[in-house]
């Protein structure tokens, strides 16, 4: 009777009188385990002595009322068996076989239950009529408890009838007596709370204090609060202790209660709903709460001293629980290895096993006290130790029960304790150690309902603690360790602890447990442990994410849990490593199994060890085990195990999911606790809201608190919840509570809220114990799940959209063969299975691999985005490392039919060929999903990141990183990580990662978005990262596409003309330019990234349509914008995003190509990225993720200013890649180029660049960096210098170029400017040479080019041998390139040309030749152009020129190149593009070109936009007309010209060479170009180069490049005319249109007029863009028209024309200029207004690019473009096309696209100056360029007047004007 004494002592200590004590009656049998849940209320648990016995006793009862008869003796075995069996109640099961013996002995000792009483109970249970027999069968089958009023005559035997009549005679005037029969499953909780006394006039007697809402008892109306229980199965209980009563009630499956009720309350004997509604129930719960934790504590303490009893308690409890609950509940079992281990641990702890095994704990859940209870408890909460436990208990019914009688430990009442304790204490004890050991089991353990609810954590913790407490003596630290390790390990967090601290043991966690145990002051006796645990948890683990786990685990978990939490925290890395998909480690798994088996055995022992000695033994066993095989429990092992198992996070998630799942249904399930649950939930919610206070008042609170701590941890509250959830999952009640909380709190995401909606909704019976306990880690009560099988194909109903939260709990009965025999045969063998979830045959998610034979616990949750989906398929595959995975089972659910009925479902899905998969689903409709109401942060009370305003987040983050792009760090980090890991992952953005892990990651981001570890070691599943990114976008208070702007885009899409792709793209991009700064930058950043993803669609299977389907709604949908009553239209955002992705540049393809070329040349690229611009892009692309491989996009760039250049390089590469992508569309290219300059413009804000401009910028940066090295490394630099017209000319030479532009020259201005910041001069120098060299070096194909070059060069030879050589080389390069990449041959040539133009580039291409060219200023300039072109081409090719990106690239890139290394960049791109374009032209697919150009434009726009909100882009949009009017015919061209002109003016000759190269080139180049051009785009450029050579081969070269760009922008096939115009820019086209005018014309099918004009200036025209300043001019104009059409080319040319000789250098630019203008327009969408002009203008952006390109080369040229662009963008242009560095000024301006958009640009600039980090840079460039631009502009104006006309609208007069304005603005 020690226990009994102890119990009394506890009672005394707690000061809880019997009256105050309330017991949760009847274990929850719903679970199929004997859950003394009801009994197991915290109060109950306290009676230590009893509980232990109680537990077993209860276990027996629960386990099997019938098993019980097997005899207490059997209980010993039974317990073990039950554990094993996992079927019957945890305790009872355990007690099952040996029930009688064990239970009796134990009960006798612990409680006053004698063998006679047991026999009586059994007799009544077995002596029943047919009705009852049918009811028993029904219950077994369905799991639903049956409650009915029984007539005495139905009692069976005569004896029984007589006894019943005697009881009936106790009725009097005020009371009626009736018999109520309750038929339940063995471990099922009744959902009753009982107390001593009625709280009024009686202090003795057993009264029902409350009934769980929605429970079977509640719904039956047969029992009501305040009824007195006279007898249970005819055993008089009026004088028994509550614990004994609880135990008695939990033993049998058939309970016959003799109830005395007040008359009138319910009507005389009328059972019924009235009771249900009676308010009476609630007060009792409160009372229940009152019970002191101390009792439990004492009990626990007692237990400590008497391990046996605690073990007993645990055992009965734990054992059963272990099987079912542990398996099911915690999900430990889920992880088979882990769970095995855990199980073992669990079992090892005698008590623990019992507790865990206690499926009834689920039942117990129902008991969790209602909020009132919780409320009360909270009051107690203050006393930490006691109150903590109290809290935990208080929170739930369970806790209430605990209080009533130390259910857990069974401290107060012997009998109740068994079950109760089993739930609470047992769970607590064993749970602690064992729970920890196997957290999942702990969940089962935790099945204590109360624990499950909120108490769950408490309970779990409690259990664990209890166990640990119990064990501490017995198991000592080791067991604790194991427990912790097991449980936590499972979670990952616990893992560490386990290793570090023995859970129970004295070790910190253990110590706490022990301490707690020693201090009976805890409110719950059983819970004590939990209490202590939780308290420790709080203290100890408060901080750790585990906190939530602890909370999940409950007090017990607390100690262990807390410790484990700490461990988890410590092992956060492990946790972080959780991989939802990764398979559990085999070794671990085996180990896990071994341990689990051991645990189970131990557990069984536990069952056995109802007796204290057993308990001790068990503890000993556990300890021994641990000690003996420390490895099993080592932290590392656990960690590994964890890893293998879903991760801690997965487990947590699993638990949480289960908990959620159960929680929803559990409302009913825990009938007793149902009402409590609601209260608890409410309480929890409040707690949740104030997550900060870890120790919630109630159990729930406590859980919440723990959760909160977790949130403090890296994981977010939800995650923590999940972690806590592990335990909670085990305990349905708690789980349910938690789930509800989750639902209500919705941690964070709308998806999170999904749960909240139906948290309490589906009352499901407790988890069933039907599945064999041994295999079940998750306790599943089939009765809670609706059987579902999709027989008929889905009728054609509308699909379902929104978010579907789906929790895949487990698979049961997954037999390998149809026949049972086969199944049994394979039962022994384990298989590795994983689940795949598909929606309408599209793969959406997959779970981790689980091992088992028939039972598999995946316990993972996912949040699936639904867009009109109708069917959900669950496919189970066998995992095989060697062979193809085999589909083993499949089941389908009709979403459209099932979700229309209700958003919440718990389904037992029948799968073929046989088996069942248990699933919980919660649907959130689109209106709720896209309400975009931010969830307040727990700390701040308002959303700090997720759900916070974009501008606010960006402004806050920019304080720490001034100058960084206005893109939220969370997006940047996620995108960088995705690109770093590769964009070839199948299903990127479509697949969902584990919802739990996602929440953990969200928590981490909320805490510190910069410090989050996203490495594969921490976040193995990339889909978790993409899920966080989507959640962030979905939760923005306002969509990234603002509502009005989204409507505009939808309208624009509706009016798009099929035959005007370019205009369509311009229009769309112009709209995007209206976005607010942060939105625009972020959108451009994302579109750059998404275009990369789409560019890898062959490998990642994510086409533009697929990606738009996933990303469109989060980016654009807003519930407020939907018509009231109407469904949200998902088709519009999908169509808009798809269109944007189609017109956006796709850097990746190019990247890849580049990568190929750059692969070997990575060093070369860096060292000799003379073709930096092009190469850069390529380089970026090479990595295959926007240069991510280099890390351009990574935060590294922003992070390391020192490495800024490198970063920039990388970025440039990325940009380049984007350019390649762009190449498909001219405008896109332009965008890219613009973007580059923009980025460069913000050179100062390296961070910003890296961020926003990452893609584009990186591209440019890469170019720049690459170029630099290249220059440094070789003559490439020399070429660049030329580009810087006058200043460099002196250097002409590579050295100068390299030096001055060295950094950024080639790729983008000066390195430091990084393209954008570079001073105009720098830019100039950089202008052509650098870039070209970069590309060359990257290409590494220069030699072949060289070979070809000679041939091509022949034409250019005219200029200068050197130049011609250069030209030749260029030409060669082009040809070679072509050979290399047929697609891009032309482009390549052009690019080569450009490269050649750049002497240094040339050199790179062909060292000697380059040098040669370098020597001659002119020559070097041309070479520059050539090099640029060549390099561009090669780069491009490498980049995958052939892609449309090439075209776009050409334009854009040309622009970029121009900007970066003017000629090089733009030319390079140009070259490639030109090729493409040429082919397009040939094919006469103007439309295609146009479309491409359109795409390009969009990309460009975006790019630009992104990079810096480019002035150009906006301007055109804003005042396309303005520019147009000003420039109307001329202005624009002039603008373009401007760029060129200055060059010409500026260094006519030298300038020509450099920037003015074009000019020089103009004359001679022209013819040369023509030839070249004709030959090859690049060659033409080469020619130009040659011509330029004469005067400035460069110019020519450049021009061709430019031309090429335009042309290249196959985007603008239609821009072909541009090509024509390019002709004029022969130089630019030059490359493309080798022949100046003619070629240009030819090249551009663009415009004949251009052609004509071009032709006439052909050489020059082409040159115009290029070097042909004068000729160029005329040509330009002509071209302008064509160009305008072409956009890139035309403008470029036209502008090029502006060529102003400048054209020479700008020629490429020029081309670009023209293009730029066109592009600009295009970009802006304004251009369309102007029609042809518009086209040109659009391209103009590109042209501008070119122009600025030119500019770089020649200030003037650059300026012209620049001015035009500049004005618009102001710096934007410039920096954008810094890239063009060559034409620094121009660069800036060109970017502005300003030629025609000049005004707008200016405006834009002014507008966005503040916004644009790069503005200053712009200014700088513009300033320089400004002047030049002016000069050029004028020149351009002259020449380009007609061109202006063409581009008029674009550059329009503006160009000139714009230039001036721009300057002024500057």
Curated annotation (Swiss-Prot):
SMART domains: C2, PDZ, RhoGAP. The keyword Phosphoprotein applies. It is found in: Presynapse. Keywords: Cell projection, GTPase activation, Phosphoprotein, Synapse. The record marks 990 as: Arginine finger. Changing residue 190 to A: Reduced interaction with Nrx-1. CDD domains: C2, PDZ_Par6-like, RhoGAP_SYD1. GO terms for cellular component: cell projection; neuromuscular junction; presynaptic active zone; presynaptic active zone cytoplasmic component; synaptic membrane. The keyword Phosphoprotein applies. Residues 22-98, 262-336, 466-530, 745-775, 1273-1328, 1356-1380, 1393-1479, 1514-1607, 1644-1727, 1819-1840 are annotated as: Disordered. Residues 1659-1670 have a biased composition (Gly residues). Pfam families: C2_SYDE, PDZ, RhoGAP. Residues 750-760, 1356-1377, 1393-1408, 1416-1429, 1538-1587 have a biased composition (Polar residues). The modification Phosphoserine is found at residue 719. Residues 179-264 form the PDZ domain. InterPro entries: C2_dom, C2_domain_sf, PDZ, PDZ_sf, Rho-GAP_regulator, Rho_GTPase_activation_prot, RhoGAP_dom. GO terms for molecular function: GTPase activator activity. One of its GO terms (biological process) is synapse assembly. PROSITE patterns: C2 (PS50004), PDZ (PS50106), RHOGAP (PS50238). Residues 59-77, 1293-1302, 1443-1479, 1590-1607, 1644-1658, 1671-1688, 1696-1720 have a biased composition (Low complexity). Residues 271-286, 1282-1292 have a biased composition (Pro residues). Disruption phenotype: Reduced synpatic bouton numbers in neuromuscular junctions (NMJs). Defects in the organization of the remaining active zones in NMJs. Reduced Nrx-1 and Nlg-1 levels at presynapse. Deficit in early GluRIIA incorporation in postsynpase assembly. Residues 301-326, 1830-1839 have a biased composition (Basic and acidic residues). Interacts (via PDZ domain) with Nrx-1; may recruit Nrx-1 to the presynaptic active zone. GTPase activator for the Rho-type GTPases by converting them to an inactive GDP-bound state. Promotes the anchoring of Liprin-alpha clusters at synapses. Recruits and keeps Nrx-1 levels high in active zones in the presynapse opposite the postsynaptic region. This is Rho GTPase-activating protein 100F. It comes from Drosophila melanogaster (Fruit fly).
């Amino acid at each position: 009777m020690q226990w009994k004494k102890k119990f009394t002592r506890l009672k005394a200590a707690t000061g809880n009188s019997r009256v105050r004590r309330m017991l949760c009656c009847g274990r929850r049998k719903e679970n199929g385990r004997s859950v003394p849940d009801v009994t197991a209320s915290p109060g109950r648990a306290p009676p230590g002595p009893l509980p232990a016995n109680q537990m077993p006793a209860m276990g027996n009862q629960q386990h099997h009322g019938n098993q019980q008869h097997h005899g207490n003796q059997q209980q010993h075995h039974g317990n073990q068996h039950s554990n094993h069996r996992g079927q019957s109640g945890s305790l009872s099961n355990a007690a099952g076989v040996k029930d009688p013996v064990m239970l009796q002995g134990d009960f006798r000792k612990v409680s006053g239950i004698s063998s006679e009483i047991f026999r009586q109970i059994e007799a009544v249970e077995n002596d029943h009529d047919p009705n009852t027999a049918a009811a028993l069968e029904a219950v077994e089958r369905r799991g639903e408890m049956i409650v009915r009023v029984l007539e005495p005559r139905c009692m069976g035997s005569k004896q029984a009838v007589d006894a019943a009549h005697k009881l009936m005679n106790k009725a009097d005037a005020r009371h009626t007596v009736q018999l109520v029969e309750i038929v339940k499953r063995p471990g099922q909780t009744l959902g009753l709370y009982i107390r001593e006394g009625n709280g009024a006039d009686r202090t003795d007697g057993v009264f029902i204090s409350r009934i769980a809402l929605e429970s079977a008892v509640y719904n039956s109306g047969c029992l009501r609060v305040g009824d007195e229980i006279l007898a249970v199965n005819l055993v008089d209980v009026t004088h028994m202790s509550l614990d004994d009563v609880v135990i008695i009630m939990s033993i049998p499956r058939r309970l016959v209660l003799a109830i005395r009720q007040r008359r009138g309350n319910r009507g005389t004997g009328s059972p019924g709903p009235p009771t249900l509604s009676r308010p009476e129930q609630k007060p009792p719960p409160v009372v229940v709460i009152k019970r002191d934790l101390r009792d439990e504590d004492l009990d626990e303490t007692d237990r400590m001293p008497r391990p046996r009893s605690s073990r007993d308690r645990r055992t009965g409890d734990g054992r059963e629980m272990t099987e079912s609950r542990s398996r099911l509940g915690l999900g430990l079992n889920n992880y088979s290895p882990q769970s095995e281990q855990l199980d073992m641990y669990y079992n090892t702890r005698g008590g623990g096993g019992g507790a865990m095994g206690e499926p009834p704990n689920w039942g117990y859940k129902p008991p969790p006290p209602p909020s009132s209870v919780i409320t009360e408890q909270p009051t107690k909460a203050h006393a930490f130790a006691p109150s903590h436990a109290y809290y935990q208990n208080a929170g739930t019914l369970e806790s209430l029960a605990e209080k009533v009688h130390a259910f857990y430990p069974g401290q107060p009442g012997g009998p109740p304790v068994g079950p109760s304790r089993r739930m609470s204490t047992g769970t607590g004890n064993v749970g602690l150690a064992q729970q920890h050991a196997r957290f999942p089991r702990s969940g089962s353990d935790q099945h204590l309902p109360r624990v499950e609810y909120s108490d769950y954590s408490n309970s779990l913790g409690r259990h664990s603690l209890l166990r640990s407490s119990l064990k501490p003596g017995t198991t000592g630290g080791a067991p604790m360790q194991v427990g912790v390790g097991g449980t936590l390990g499972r979670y990952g967090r616990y893992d560490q602890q386990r290793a570090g601290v023995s859970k129970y043991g004295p070790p910190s966690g253990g110590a706490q447990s022990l301490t707690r145990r020693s201090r009976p002051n805890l409110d719950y006796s059983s819970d004590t442990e939990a209490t202590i645990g939780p308290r420790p948890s709080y203290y100890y683990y408060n901080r750790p994410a585990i906190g939530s786990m602890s909370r999940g685990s409950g007090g017990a978990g607390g100690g262990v849990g807390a410790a484990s939490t700490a461990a988890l925290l410590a092992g956060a890395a492990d946790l972080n490593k959780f991989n939802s998909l990764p398979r559990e480690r085999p070794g671990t798994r085996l180990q896990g199994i071994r341990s689990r088996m051991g645990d189970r055995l131990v557990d069984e022992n536990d069952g056995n060890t109802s007796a204290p000695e057993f308990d001790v033994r068990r503890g000993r066993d556990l300890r021994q085990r641990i000690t003996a095989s420390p490895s099993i429990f080592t932290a590392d092992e656990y960690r590994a195990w964890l890893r293998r198992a879903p991760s801690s996070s997965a487990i947590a998630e699993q638990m949480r999911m289960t908990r959620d799942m159960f929680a929803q249904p559990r409302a009913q399930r825990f009938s007793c606790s149902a009402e409590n649950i609601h209260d608890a939930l409410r309480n929890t919610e409040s707690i949740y809201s104030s997550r900060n206070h870890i120790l919630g008042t109630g159990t729930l609170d406590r859980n919440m608190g723990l959760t909160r701590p977790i949130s403090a941890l890296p994981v977010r509250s939800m995650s923590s919840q999940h972690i806590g959830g592990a335990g909670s999952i085990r305990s349905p009640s708690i789980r349910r509570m938690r789930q509800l909380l989750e639902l209500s709190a919705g941690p964070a995401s709308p998806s999170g809220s999904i749960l909240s909606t139906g948290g309490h909704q589906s009352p499901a019976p407790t988890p069933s114990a039907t599945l064999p306990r041994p295999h079940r880690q998750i306790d599943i009560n089939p009765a809670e799940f609706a059987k579902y099988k999709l027989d008929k194909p889905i009728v054609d109903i509308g699909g379902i959209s929104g978010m579907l939260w789906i929790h895949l709990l487990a698979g049961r009965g997954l037999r390998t063969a149809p026949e049972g025999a086969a199944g049994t045969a394979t039962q022994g063998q384990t298989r590795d299975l994983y689940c795949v979830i598909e929606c309408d045959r599209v793969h959406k998610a997959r779970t981790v691999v689980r091992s088992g034979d028939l039972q598999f616990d995946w316990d993972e949750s996912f949040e699936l985005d639904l867009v009109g989906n109708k069917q959900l398929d669950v496919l189970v595959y066998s995992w095989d490392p060697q062979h193809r995975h085999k589909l083993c089972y499949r089941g389908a659910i009709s979403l459209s039919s099932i979700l229309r009925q209700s958003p919440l479902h718990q389904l037992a899905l029948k799968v073929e060929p046989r088996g069942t998969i248990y699933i919980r689903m919660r649907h959130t409709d689109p209106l709720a999903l896209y309400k975009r109401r931010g969830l307040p942060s727990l700390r701040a009370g308002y959303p700090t990141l997720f759900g916070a305003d974009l501008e606010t987040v960006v402004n806050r983050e920019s304080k720490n990183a001034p100058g960084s792009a206005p893109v939220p760090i969370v997006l940047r980090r996620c995108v960088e990580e995705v690109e770093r890991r590769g964009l070839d992952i199948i299903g990127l953005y479509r697949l969902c990662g584990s919802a739990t892990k996602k929440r953990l990651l969200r928590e981490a981001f909320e805490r510190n978005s910069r410090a989050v570890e996203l490495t594969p070691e921490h976040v193995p599943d990339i889909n978790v990262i993409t899920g966080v990114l989507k959640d962030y976008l979905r939760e923005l208070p306002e969509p990234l596409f603002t509502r009005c702007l989204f409507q505009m885009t939808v309208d624009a899409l509706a009016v798009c003309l099929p035959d005007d792709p370019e205009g369509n793209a311009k229009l769309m991009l112009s709209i995007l330019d209206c976005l607010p700064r942060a939105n625009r930058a972020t959108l451009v950043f994302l579109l750059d990234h998404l275009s990369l993803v789409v560019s890898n669609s062959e490998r990642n299977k994510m086409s533009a349509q697929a990606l738009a389907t996933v990303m469109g709604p989060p980016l654009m949908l807003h519930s407020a914008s939907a018509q009231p009553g109407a469904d949200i239209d998902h088709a519009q955002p999908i169509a808009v995003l798809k269109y944007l992705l189609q017109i956006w540049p796709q850097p990746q393809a190019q990247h890849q190509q580049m990568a190929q070329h750059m692969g070997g040349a990575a060093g070369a690229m860096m060292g000799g990225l003379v073709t930096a611009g092009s190469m850069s892009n390529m380089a970026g692309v090479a990595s295959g993720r926007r240069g991510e491989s280099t890390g351009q996009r990574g935060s590294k760039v922003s992070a390391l200013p020192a490495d800024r250049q490198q970063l920039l390089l990388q970025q440039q590469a990325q940009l380049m890649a984007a350019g390649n992508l762009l190449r498909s569309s001219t405008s896109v290219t332009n965008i890219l180029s613009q973007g580059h300059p923009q980025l460069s413009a913000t050179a100062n804000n390296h961070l910003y660049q890296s961020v926003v401009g990452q893609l584009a910028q990186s591209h440019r940066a890469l170019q720049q960096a690459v170029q630099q090295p290249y220059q440094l490394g070789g003559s490439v630099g020399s070429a660049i210098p030329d580009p810087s017209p006058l200043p460099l000319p002196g250097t002409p030479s590579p050295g100068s170029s390299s030096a001055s532009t060295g950094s950024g020259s080639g790729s983008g201005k000066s390195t430091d400017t990084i393209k954008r910041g570079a001073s105009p001069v720098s830019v100039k120098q950089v202008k052509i040479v650098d870039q070209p060299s970069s590309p060359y070096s990257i290409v590494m194909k220069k030699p072949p080019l060289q070979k070809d070059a000679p041939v091509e060069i022949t034409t250019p030879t005219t200029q200068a041998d050197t130049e011609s050589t250069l030209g030749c080389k260029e030409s060669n390069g082009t040809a070679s390139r072509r050979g290399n990449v047929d697609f891009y041959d032309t482009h390549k040539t052009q690019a080569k040309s450009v490269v050649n133009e750049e002497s240094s580039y040339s050199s790179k291409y062909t060292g000697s030749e380059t040098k040669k060219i370098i020597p001659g200023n002119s020559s070097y300039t041309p070479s520059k152009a050539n090099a640029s072109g060549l390099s561009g081409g090669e780069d491009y090719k490498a980049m995958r020129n052939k892609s449309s990106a090439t075209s776009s690239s050409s334009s854009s890139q040309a622009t970029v190149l121009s900007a970066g290394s003017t000629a090089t960049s733009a030319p390079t791109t140009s070259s490639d593009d030109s090729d493409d374009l040429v082919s397009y032209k040939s094919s006469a697919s103007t439309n295609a070109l146009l479309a491409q150009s359109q795409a390009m434009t969009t990309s460009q726009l975006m790019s630009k936009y992104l990079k810096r909100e480019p002035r150009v882009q906006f301007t055109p949009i804003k005042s396309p007309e303005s520019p147009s009017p000003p420039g109307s015919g001329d202005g624009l061209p002039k603008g373009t010209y401007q760029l060129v002109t200055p060059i010409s003016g500026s260094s006519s000759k030298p300038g020509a060479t450099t920037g003015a190269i074009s000019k020089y080139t103009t004359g001679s180049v022209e013819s040369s170009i023509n030839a070249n051009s004709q030959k090859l785009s690049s060659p033409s450029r080469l020619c130009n180069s040659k011509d330029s050579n004469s005067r400035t081969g460069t110019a020519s070269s450049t021009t061709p490049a430019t031309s090429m760009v335009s042309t290249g922008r196959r985007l603008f096939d239609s821009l072909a005319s541009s090509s024509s115009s390019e002709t004029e820019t022969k130089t630019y086209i030059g490359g493309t249109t080798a022949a100046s005018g003619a070629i240009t014309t030819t090249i551009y099918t663009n415009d004949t007029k251009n052609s004509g004009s071009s032709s006439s200036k052909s050489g020059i025209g082409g040159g115009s863009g290029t070097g042909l300043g004068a000729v160029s001019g005329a040509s330009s104009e002509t071209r302008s028209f064509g160009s305008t059409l072409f956009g890139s080319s035309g403008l470029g040319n036209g502008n090029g024309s502006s060529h102003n000789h400048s054209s020479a250098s700008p020629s490429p630019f020029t081309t670009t200029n023209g293009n730029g203008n066109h592009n600009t327009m295009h970009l802006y969408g304004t251009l369309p207004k102007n029609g042809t002009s518009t086209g040109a203008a659009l391209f103009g952006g590109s042209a501008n690019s070119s122009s600025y390109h030119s500019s770089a080369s020649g200030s003037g040229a650059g300026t012209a473009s620049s001015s035009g662009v500049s004005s618009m963008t102001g710096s934007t242009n410039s920096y954008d096309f810094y890239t063009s560095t060559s034409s620094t000024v121009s660069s800036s301006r060109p970017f502005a696209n300003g030629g025609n958009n000049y005004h707008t640009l200016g405006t834009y600039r002014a507008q966005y100056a503040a916004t644009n980090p790069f503005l200053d840079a712009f200014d700088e460039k513009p300033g320089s360029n400004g002047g030049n631009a002016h000069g050029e502009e004028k020149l351009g104006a002259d020449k380009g007047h007609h061109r202006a006309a063409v581009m008029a609208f674009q550059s329009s007069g503006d160009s000139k004007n714009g230039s001036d304005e721009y300057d002024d603005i500057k």
